[in-house]
Amino acid sequence: TDSVTIVHNAGQSNQLSEHRLDSNRNHFMEEVSAIAFGDWHEEFDYQFATAQESRNTYNGQGDPNDFMGPALWPSSLSHFAEENQDPGGLLGSHIDMLHESPLGMGIAHDSENVYWYYDGYYGELVRYDFQEDHDTGEDDHSDGKVRRYSDVSLTRVPGIPGHMEMNHNNGILYIADTGAGRIIWVNTDGPGVTTNIMGDETQMEPLAEYSEVTGVEWGILDSGLSFPSGIALHQGVLFVSQNGNGKITGYNLDDDGKGVTRSRTVSTNAGSIMGLEVGPSGKLWYVDSQNNKVIRIDPYEDTDFDEVRDSLDVYPNNSLLWSDSDGDGYADQS
């Protein structure tokens, strides 16, 4: 719907939601697929950026021209979808956009106005730096810096986002590579070889930098998944949703973030599970696209990972000897 639904006081008794549509959404938010919040801005509050699964047809009004990529927005509710909403004026409330990646499937914030982007059209990872925003509704993008990480091959599945998550403590970026059925990690702080590709046919506008980066460190965290889509990181656990079977897996990560010490999977009744996020209270939320719902999971503590909650487990730290298979509140002995 090229729009944003804002849920206020989520999960509370006074919860309410509103639906906002920007006047220029048919380009700047056409077929929006993913969202990532960034740094605080004294005028715009926390800025956020969106990915668009579009080749830029202005909602079917024209032939695709592939002039598409990430858009930057203000989260301030006095700016977003409020400024420049009259026809014939400035270009809505967006505050920047770059256009080298049609069919965007995922996005993650790095720092300042730098975002990582899942380029579904060219099938690779791209780093976008908007640098200074151009203010609401303007169109000067010439200070943008774009780097294509061509070693990181990604496979798009139409209609299923491949979300991304950055660990800001160590620079490891996690990507749901949906079509390949895997979760990959990329060391964004590691070395690489940068080549100037200014003037390449994939460049769609004047830029301050356009380059290709090769030789980066990356790897596979897990594979054999059924269309992984949502992804969220919380206290050393990476949560991943699988659109193909409605399951969510939590991966306890190694100290370096490149491997897994253990994992657990739960099933949901989602018709088409997609995005994940951990809220301020530490509870996991997921999107069910088919049923048009946002669902919260209220977890229980299970220190020993024996699938018996600590409140019912007589010996919660010993998963080899104790469990409560009949749910009577007493430990089984075997």
Regions flagged by a language model, labelled:
Residues 271-301, 305:
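Blade-level signature of beta-propeller repeat domains, shared across WD40, Kelch, NHL, RCC1
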Residues 50-70, 128:
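Short, conserved, GDST-rich strand-edge loop motifs in beta-rich repeat architectures
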Residues 174-182, 186, 211-255:
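Loop/turn-rich, solvent-exposed surfaces of beta-rich toroidal or solenoidal domains
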Residues 1, 25-46, 94-114, 148-171, ...:
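Beta-rich, blade/repeat-based domains predominating
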Residues 1-2, 9, 40, 51-55, ...:
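Short loop/turn segments immediately following the C-termini of beta-strands
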Residues 6-14, 73-86, 128-141, 185-207, ...:
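Short loop/turn segments immediately following beta-strands, especially the blade-tip
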Residues 299-334:
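Extracellular calcium-associated, cysteine-rich motifs in secreted modular proteins
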Residues 30-33, 61-108:
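Asp-box/WD-like beta-propeller blade repeats and closely related beta-sheet repeat scaffolds
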